[in-house]
Amino acid sequence: MPSSSDELIFFVNGKKVIEKNPVPEMNLLFYVRKVLHLTGTKYSCGGGGCGACTVMISRYNPESKKIYHYPATACLVPVCSLHGAAVTTVEGVGSIKRRIHPVQERLAKCHGTQCGFCSPGMVMSIYTLLRNHPEPTPDQITEALGGNLCRCTGYRPIVESGKTFSPESSVCQMKGSGKCCMDLDEGCSESTKERMCTKLYNEDEFQPLDPSQEPIFPPELIRMAEDPHKRRLTFQGERTIWIMPVTLNGLLELKASYPEAPLVMGNTAVGPGMKFNNEFHPVFISPLGLPELNLVDTANSGGVTIGARHSLAQMKDILHSLTLEQPKEKTKTHQALLKHLRTLAGPQIRNMATLGGHVVSRPDFSDLNPILAAGNATINVISKEGQRQIPLNGPFLERLPEASLKPEEVALSVFIPYSGQWQYVSGLRLAQRQENAFAIVNAGMSVEFEEGTNTIKDLQMLFGSVAPTVVSASQTCKQLIGRQWDDQMLSDACQLVLEEIRIPPDAEGGMVEYRRTLIISLLFKFYLKVRRWLSEMDPQKFPDIPEKFVSALDDLPIETPQGIQMFQCVDPNQPEQDPVGHPIMHQSGIKHATGEAKFVDDMPRINQELCLTVVTSTRAHAKITSIDVSEALAYPGVVDVITAEDVPGDNNHSGEIFYAQNEVICVGQIICTVAADTYIHAKEAAKRVKITYDDIEPAIITIEQALEHNSFLSSEKKIEQGNVDYAFKHVDHIIEGEIHVEGQEHFYMETQTILAIPQTEDKEMVLHVGTQFPTHVQEYVSAALKVPRNRIACQMKRTGGAFGGKVTKPALLGAVCAVAAHKTGRPIRFILDRSNDMLITAGRHPLLGKYKIGFMNNGKIKAADVEYYTNGGCTPDESEMVIEFIVLKSENAYHIPNFRCRGRACKTNLPSNTAFRGFGFPQATVVVEAYIAAVASKCNLLPEEIREINMYKQISKTAYKQTFNPEPLRRCWKECLQKSSFFARKQAAEEFNKNNYWKKKGLAVVPMKFSVAVPMAFYNQAAALVHIFLDGSVLLTHGGCELGQGLHTKMIQVASRELNIPKSYVHLVETSTVTVPNAVFTAGSMGADINGKAVQNACQTLLDRLQPIIKKNPKGKWEEWVKKAFEESISLSATGYFKGYQTNMDWEKEEGDPYPYYVYGAACSEVEVDCLTGAHKLLRTDIFMDAAFSINPALDIGQVEGAFIQGMGFYTIEELKYSPKGVLYSRGPDDYKIPTVTEIPEEFYVTMVRSRNPIAIYSSKGLGEAGMFLGSSVLFAIYDAVTTARKERGLSDIFPLNSPATPEVIRMACKDQFTDMIPRDDPSTFTPWSIHVS
């Protein structure tokens, strides 16, 4: 092996980079962040699944003389692969210092950024699209964003910012109506009498896009690419070598010398294997520049040959061109491939992954290989021994040795034949979400008929994601040859394929019965498609399928979302410089979009800084018998291993354990940490820590197991009104049931991050941390280090999303990090990778709800007895408070005169669940709405009618005896029903359902009464500190944390109004325990409420001090008044304080005033469900939210939309999977699916309804959490659709539709002849792969 390296040459943002010692194992993300210090490109998942690290890569093709720009996830791009390429990061697009690019400006001004962590990736995806298509269509914009995740905004404003570049995007966004969206047909409601606005930004402010001003591709790289004397390059690393051949013969010689070396082109298979499966390769071969791998040959009349180096995106373009050039009958395989190429992964991965790599790696989940095999494709391979063709068929995909490439062989190209006149080819798939998700089951099928007949001449069926490899139903196909394509053939085919493809009951991936059902459901779809095609070929000979079956043919479409946001216009008499009530851009919006907003891990490396990684328990409940750290300590770069023995103070604080000692109580509990000079060294050393255990019984994983063992974290909480037992004796009907609601992962884009810096004096320590509760971090670090809190400073500028997940968890992790910093005496950077973040920090509490409801024939509920149990995990965390909130909020919007509610948090051997947006309300109210739906079914009424009958209608007392006025609730409910055209659309859906057997539409409207703040008054207080400087500028600090919700922006608006100065005068640096001590958490939707009051108080104090000077010089300027005040020795600094809402709750008396006010709302959602697959599409959502007076409508609407989409994900596609032994499987974006841009409503309308709330700052309301529950309107719309399907099939319309309503849950509820056909296994004979923990 060569001992020296060649120089790696590439460009980054127009600047030449010459790397003399390139490291083959280093990726581009690490390189730009840690070597080039370009921190705008973010680390979020590390596996190419989230898009936060998106960059643009540009390459020159010397054959075509063209420059190709494409998006790529930097975390998967080996830096050595970039020789001769140009990389553009977000810093290269534009900056505040240089020039803001129109993409960055519009993303910020359209309010497409909240926490800002995903924003650079969004910018790069749109920017790359514009470099290739300066005037994109709306569909291209949606497609370009398909690989980017955002947890804050709900995507709508991001898409809207992109659509401003599209000439097809009109001002009015109502589609197909032929009239303006503001022409409301259904009467005038109270809100329409108010002056309502619909524009959150001014398009006239946007600078135009000028493609001619974009940076040119470096001419030097063109010369390099065209150099006829190129030579082989070798990059030598510490453990590995990277070789780039420049000729085909050179490649074949290398493959002969290193037959096991992987060919790295896109790195989308090799890279994840190294990161997640600990695969190691001493040699990499990268044949990126070989023209033989880049060919496209359409000269062969039998088909097309596509070079193995072509990316999947290039393949898509090639196939699309062919479908335009060739007759439709010849391109059926191409069309099937194109359908899957639209949804396979995201655009970044499609532009990186290559055809050759995808085919040869043969993933079991491949969406393309089954179609290629069904279309009789072949692979052209070559070695030093010569060329040959390998059929891309079942034996190849099943990895049979005789059908596979030899180790020394290289795939040159793939030949895709044209389809025959009497051949039909189709690809089918179903995934947890429409795009960027591995298929749960996919298939490639083709059939060829004897000419002019429906007699099967040849048949191929291949299925993915049902076995360790793609499998071919070859025996089934053989038996069906010669048969007629009719219903009997279908019935036999289903039986045969189920016998041939057996999914074991304990198969990896679970969902066994569902996957069995999908196999034959997809086969049925194929059968219908072929029937329809035959009918088109000869309508006289081949009858068409029944009209009611036609909708089963097509997948649910991907549409570009659009909508309207309505809010109250600002009073025209309000002073121009007063920003309150205006839709002002997030104060860091531009910095988010340029990547200049700094997060913790963006901070420069400190001298002697160490990186920290964790070693966690692999057992749910066990005694630790030994910990051997010797091998880890000996690893290069390791400074120390930290254990419980190193904690100088409390290792168990308030029930939270920092380092496990003697015993572990969950999988994922931190046992020790490794501190090393680099993250790579720390991570590798952590793998070498050896821990032995003795299991302890029982290991309690589920709620039911906890109930069986009487294992609880808290005492029972209860409220009761009326006489429940008596009422049950005097009702017409009683129903009982239970609902399981699974948990939810926060999936904030920035994982938990801490930088702990020990000081040289007085045992002081400074922590930079992403948190919602700096005081809590300070408390835990103080306890762990055994020093007073005044020695611990916690500083927090911003964090990349939180949603409750950064209330308590940063305190525990901060203590862990601080102990390491204390022991080593060096700064410690502690950044959890996504896998460990999901494993350690847990999320929303799973819940089991049991109900008994008594009601009258007319639907009036007279009595309810409800029990709630949550899975709290292994330590207290916030579980007791969550169960209190669940019990208090459990009535939602309904007055039930005899009501009993009890709740208890279960103790299990799972990582401790914690705060999450809505804090128990989203789980509890699903149970409420479920029993409302059950009552409706029993009474043969619409659920909306039952909701109306039982809703609070006048000033009333809650079950805990707090008085409130439901008028805003009634208003939101009525406007939602009216303006969503619910009853007309419901009727239209019923008509659709009559005419379509396999697809059903459903609608639901849910009301909401959501309480704000905390029942303990001391948690509602706040403080602020305001300084006025002599130039008139104002520095503002307060105790709240900027999480993306725009809290700092609102505080600047408050200060601007109170001091009567332009908002540009006010600056806000960070939140710190030094400037504002003892601050409470930023949660409970009360950040702006309480901190706004504190800022207001401080500003009013300052203005009062200035009043004598202002009176003497009323026409003077602000700066003059400030200067005069200083000269008169008037203090220009003031603290502000808000005592807090005086809330209380007496649990012994079961009464109190626990909440200062309520937020009301209603949402109507319409879905379409595919009963054959379980897929659903959200067609439209209308939200009416009681906003009172919005301080900033843009921010508040952003919170409502973002919460709704997060809630929709919680109730539909987000699914945490655990093994029976308590191991979390869902540890990254590949395994846990949050909504993408394709999941949001096709039509999305949000109206902010005006009301009064004099108790709060400017009569506003906290809207951060309320929208979460409204996402359940999607769940109950699905329930409505499934109920219709079940009724049509003669099944009961009362059934448990648990949450989340995943495709599996939906499909298995839509029972039919196919679900009846699948074999069932005896549960006592196997251990399932995964279990539910609710």
Swiss-Prot record:
GO terms for molecular function: 2 iron, 2 sulfur cluster binding; aldehyde oxidase activity; FAD binding; flavin adenine dinucleotide binding; iron ion binding; molybdopterin cofactor binding; NAD binding; protein homodimerization activity. Residues 6-93 form the 2Fe-2S ferredoxin-type domain. Its main location: cytoplasm. It is found in: Cytoplasm. Binds 2 [2Fe-2S] clusters per subunit. Its EC number is 1.2.3.1, 1.17.3.-. The active site is at 1265 (proton acceptor). [2Fe-2S] cluster 2 binds at residues 115, 118, 150, 152. Pfam families: Ald_Xan_dh_C, CO_deh_flav_C, FAD_binding_5, Fer2, Fer2_2, MoCoBD_1, MoCoBD_2. Keywords: 2Fe-2S, Cytoplasm, FAD, Flavoprotein, Iron, Iron-sulfur, Metal-binding, Molybdenum, Oxidoreductase. AOX genes evolved from a xanthine oxidoreductase ancestral precursor via a series of gene duplication and suppression/deletion events. Different animal species contain a different complement of AOX genes encoding an equivalent number of AOX isoenzymes. In mammals, the two extremes are represented by certain rodents such as mice and rats, which are endowed with 4 AOX genes, and by humans, whose genome is characterized by a single active gene. Homodimer. Aldehyde oxidase able to catalyze the oxidation of retinaldehyde into retinoate. Acts as a negative modulator of the epidermal trophism. May be able to oxidize a wide variety of aldehydes into their corresponding carboxylates and to hydroxylate azaheterocycles. Belongs to the xanthine dehydrogenase family. This is Aldehyde oxidase 4. It comes from Rattus norvegicus (Rat). The gene is Aox4.
